[in-house]
Amino acid sequence: KNLMRIISLVAKTHREIGQYLNTPILTFWPFQVNQSYMSRLESDGSPHMSKLADLKRQLELLQDATGQVDLVIGHNDLLAANILDDGDQLWLIDWEYGGFNTPLFDLAGLAGNNGLSILQEQQMLEQYFDRSWDIYWRPYQAMKCISLMRETLWSMVSEIYSEIEFDYGAYTSENLSRLSSAILEFQQI
């Protein structure tokens, strides 16, 4: 029930928020964001240097698999903590990553960050696009990998710089595992 409400909110936001904005909007292009994180990790001597060459190779393959995209104004950080329910309506909060992106990135982030099942992902795509899920499955799965890669790289950078008391090393390991699983699933499509 809540998932359907969340998907409706995301779709409505993507389709309608632009009419309320009257200033230029930046693009949050996850391929460039990931490349930027990797460059920073390299220049700052990350303990994860040995993983970066493989991540760069995967990034290229996933960008090719994503293909041409439509742009919407996306939230780009759909963690459960960024979706509030006041009992009457849902709210998307924490828009620091907001900007133009493919809707597949928000949908992939929603699924990847919240542990949706394959059936839930397929239903999500059908509800959002009002078309059969299989049309979007391959580019969606590629974007799911990209979303998980972004979260992983962000965590790696946070290991170096964050002053927040949080086990970023464990969070990086968790996300690397989720990313590896997602890439294996993607390769089977």
Where are the predicted features?
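An alpha-helical support segment within catalytic cores of ATP-dependent transferases
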Residues: 16-76, 86
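ATP/Mg2+ or Mg2+-diphosphate-binding catalytic cores
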Residues: 43, 50, 153-189
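Pre-DFG segment of protein kinase catalytic domains
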Residues: 73, 91-94
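Active-site activation/catalytic loop segments of kinase-like enzymes and analogous catalytic loops
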Residues: 104-133, 145-164, 178
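All-alpha amphipathic helical-bundle segments outside canonical DNA-binding/catalytic cores
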Residues: 23-28, 133-144
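Conserved protein kinase catalytic/activation segment
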Residues: 82-91
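Conserved kinase catalytic-core helix
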Residues: 1-24
